[in-house]
Amino acid sequence: LPHILLSVTVPHILTLDAQVQLAEDLVAAGANIIQTEGGTSSNPTHSGVLGLIEKASPTLAAAHAISHAVSVPVLCASGISNVTAPMALAAGAAGVGVGSAVHKLNDPLAMVAVVRSLVEAMQSVKVASAAK
């Protein structure tokens, strides 16, 4: 399917090695994009920035491992915030996926503000990378 993209989410309930193997198998079967997730496997014990990092750590680890194993783009999702989105890119993800960061809000203006914050955070990584 040359003009149709297929994105497949690798379940976080698998071990990291099993996630990598599944991602490789999915790409071999025709998946064009692999998405990681963290699900409920991480329960932050801290608040603030440290809590955001704790929450996203399973999906960040999966993005790192999978992006080094497959030749297709990897999207990092679950627990992604303006703090952790740059970490996802540094881990090897081609981009991020957000859901609850947006849909938990009741105000469309706040939803747009969250997306703008994510874009700004990721652009700062690209600017820093280009400066090196």
Regions inferred by a protein language model and the residue ranges of each:
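Alpha/beta enzyme core
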Residues: 1-76, 81-132
